[in-house]
Amino acid sequence: MEALEVDDISPALEVTEEFFSTLDSNLEKAVQQAEVYGIQEVPELVGHEVLSNITDNGAMRNVTSLGKGGMIWDHCKSRLLETKAQNVFPAKEQFMVQRGTTPDNLSWMEQKEASTFNFFNICQRRRDRPRSVNDLLDETSTFKPGHARSRSDITQVDWRVVLKTTPLQQQQQQQPLLQGPHVTRPSFLLPSPNKIEDAQGNTEHKQTFPNILKKGYLEIRKDHDSYWQSCYAELSPYNLYFYSLDSSGNQNLYATYQLSHFQSISVLGNLEARMVDTVLYDNTQLQLKAESPWEALDWGQKLWEVVHAAVPGYMGRQNELTISPGLGHHDDYTQNHSFQKKTSGLLPPSPVLDSSKQYQNILKSGTLYRLTVQNNWKAFTFVLSRAYLMAFQPGKLDEDPLLSYNVDVCLAVQMDNLDGCDSCFQVIFPQDVLRLRAETRQRAQEWMEALKIAANVARSSEQNLQVTLRNKPKDQMGGHELRKNKRQSVTTSFLSILTTLSLERGLTAQSFKCAGCQRSIGLSNGKAKVCNYSGWYYCSSCHVDDSFLIPARIVHNWDTSKYKVSKQAKEFLEYVYEEPLIDIQQENAMLYHHAEPLAAVLRLRQRLKSLRAYLFSCRAAVAEDLRRRIFPREYLLQQIHLYSLADLQQVIEGKLAPFLGKVIKFATSHVYSCSLCSQKGFICEICNNGEILYPFEDISTSRCESCGAVFHSECKEKSVPCPRCVRRELQKKQKSFWQRLNMDESLEEACTMFELSYQNT
C-alpha cells in the first residue's frame, strides 16, 4: 500500500486536537457553572460527586431530566462523532423548562457565549473545509438555524415577537374572559416584519413552511378499544392533517380534522409516557402518542394554542389550563394537563369528515334523540346545513345519511311538552313530523333557533333567486326542483319504514295538520284518514282510499290483504314495486316455517343457484341464454333470500314457482346433455357405489354444509360424519400426533385420540 501523504492526514489531526481541546475547556465550564438560566444540566462524565454537590446547593429545583433526557442527538444525527459523543455532551442550548411555561429567549440570545459546549461549530468548520476543487465551486453560505431542530417541530419562531409576549401561565392568570370581537392570537400566528434578525444574526432566513406550525410522526387511535396506527401529522392554523404511510414510505392523506371541532385537549400520563387525549364535538375521542413525553406535551400545548386562536367566532368561551396531579411520590406522579373549551353560543362545529369538501355550509351538528315508530328514543347525529337536515348513525358520518329533509320546506319548529320534558321539540315537514329531544333545555333552544334561522335563510334565498330571474311566476320558477326535492324526502322517509309495522301516533303529533298538504284536519276542520303504511294522517284530498299490499305485514305476519294507503304511500310503493329490497332471512327467518308457498320457492331457488354454477362455467352462449330467461331478476340466481314486492305478490298468487320451474327444467336438461357439465358430478363417499350425483337433485341427494360434498339422502341420514371433513381435519394434525398414535393397541383407544371439529351430521 502506498503511504499516506502529510496533506491527507493533517486535516484529521487538526480537527481531533481542536475537538478534544474544546471538550476539556467546556467540560470545566460546565462543572464550574452551578446554574444556567435557572435550569441545571449535568453531563454524564461528571459523576455522582458533582451531582451531589449540585443537589446540596439547591440547584436541582428545576431539573426535569438527566443524561439522555437532555440530549437532542436522537433527532439531530450529526455525522461527526455520532456514536461516541451521544452520551457525553449536553444538547446545544436546549432549554428545559417547567411544563406550561415558555423559555427565557432573551437570556439565550444575550448570553450565547456562555452556553454549554457547542459542537455545531466544529461540525461547521469541518464541513466548510473544501474536499476537492468541485467542492469549492459548490460551497454554500454559512450555517443557518434550523438544522439542529427536532424533526417533528419545524415552527420558525419570530423571536422579537416572542420576547414581547408574556408566558403562557401569566397570560392565563392576567387575561380575563374574552368579550367582544378581539381575540389574542399566539405568537406563532402573529405577522412578523419583513426582515428580522434571528438568534444567530442571520437576516436572510425565510420560513420554509409558513402554513405548517408543527409536523411529525405520531400514533393515533379513536378510542381505548382500537389499535394504535402510525401516521404523519401536520398542524396548520386551522386544520390537523393525518397522512398514512405505505410500505415505501409514501404519504397519503388519511383524515382532516378542523380545529373548531375540538372541545377539550388533555395531556395524560407521567414523565415516562404521555399521550394527548382530545374530545370532539360529538363526544368522540382522538388520542395522539408521540415518540417522547416532552414531544407529546409540546403537541398538546401547541394544539391548544392553535385551537384557542383558530376560531374567533367563539366569543363566549372560557379557556382553562389545569394541572391535576394524581397519586404518586415526588416526580413520578401522574399529571393531567387539560385544555378545555366551554361553549355557549350558536356557532357550532361541523362534522368531522375525511374529506372537507363532502359537505359544505354546515351550520350546526350534534347528538339528538328521535322518537321512533316503536315509541322509544334513539340517538342520531344530526347535521344542519343551509339546505338539508340530515341524520347519521353515531360515529358514522362518512356513510350516507339515514334521514334527509329539505330545510326550505320546513313548516314550523315548536316545543313539544306532551311527555312533560322541557328539552323536546318538533320539526314539522310536509311529509314527516320529527319529534326530537336534546340533552338540556338550552341545547334544545339552540337547535330550534338554528333551524328557524336556516329555514328563513333558505326561503329568502329562493325569493332573491326569483327576482334575479326576471320575476318568473312561482308556479313556473323552481316548481320542478321543489317537487323533486319533496319527492326525494318522501322516498327517504318511506324507505326507512319499509319493513316496520306502522303505529298511529295521534293527531297531536302532527299538530292536527295533514302530513301531505299541511291543511288543518280533525274536529271541525275535516275528516282525518290514516295511512296503513306510514301511520300518518291525511286529508280527503291526499288520501282517496287507494289499496295496496303492505310489505311489513307480509314479512312479519304473512298478511296478504290489501290496506288503504295515502297518495304519497301508493306512489312510493309503486316506485319500489320491482326493487329487491326485502331480505326474508334478515327480517324474519321463521317465515319459511309458517308459509309453505315461500318455503317451496326457497327450495326452487336453491336448485337454481346450484344450476347457475354449472351453466356459468360452461360456454358463454349458455350463460347468456340463462340470463335472458331470468332477466331482469338476476338476483333470483344469486341471493336466494332477496325479494321484491312484486316477487312476494307472485308467491302469494302462486305464479313465481311455475316460472322458476321452467328455468330449472331448461338448466337441468342442459347439464345432463352437455359433455362438459355432465362430468362435474359427485360420488357418494359413504357408499361408493359409483353413481354420479348432482347437487341440484335435492330430492335424492343431500349436501354437506361445511365442504359441499354430495351424498345420497339415505346415506347421510345414518348420522355418519362427512368423510371429506374428516380427511381435512386429519391433514391439519401435526407430525407429533401420528408419532404418538399406536395402531397396535385396541381400536377404541386409538380412536379416542381423534378430536375433530367437524359437525357430526
UniProtKB/Swiss-Prot annotation:
Gene3D superfamilies the UniProt entry points to: Pleckstrin-homology domain (PH domain)/Phosphotyrosine-binding domain (PTB)
Q: Which residues form the PH domain?
A: 211-308, 361-456
- Main location per the UniProt record: cytoplasm
Q: Which UniProt keywords apply?
A: Cell membrane, Cytoplasm, Golgi apparatus, Membrane, Metal-binding, Phosphoprotein, Repeat, Zinc, Zinc-finger
One GO biological process term: myoblast differentiation
- What pairs make up the disulfide bonds? none
Q: Which residues carry this modification: Phosphoserine?
A: S132
Instruction: Tell me a GO cellular component.
Output: cytoplasm
Cellular compartment(s): Cytoplasm; Golgi apparatus; Cell membrane
Task: Cite a single GO MF annotation.
Answer: zinc ion binding
Zn-finger (Phorbol-ester/DAG-type) intervals are 669-722
What SUPFAM superfamilies does the record point to? PH domain-like
Q: Check the record and name the PROSITE patterns matching this protein.
A: PH_DOMAIN
What SMART domains would the database entry show? Answer: DUF4206, PH
UniProt key word Phosphoprotein:
yes
Q: Which PANTHER family match?
A: PLECKSTRIN HOMOLOGY DOMAIN CONTAINING PROTEIN, PLECKSTRIN HOMOLOGY DOMAIN-CONTAINING FAMILY M MEMBER 3
Share what the entry says about its subunit structure, partners included. Interacts with AKT1.
Known function: Involved in skeletal muscle differentiation. May act as a scaffold protein for AKT1 during muscle differentiation.
Q: What is this protein called?
A: Pleckstrin homology domain-containing family M member 3
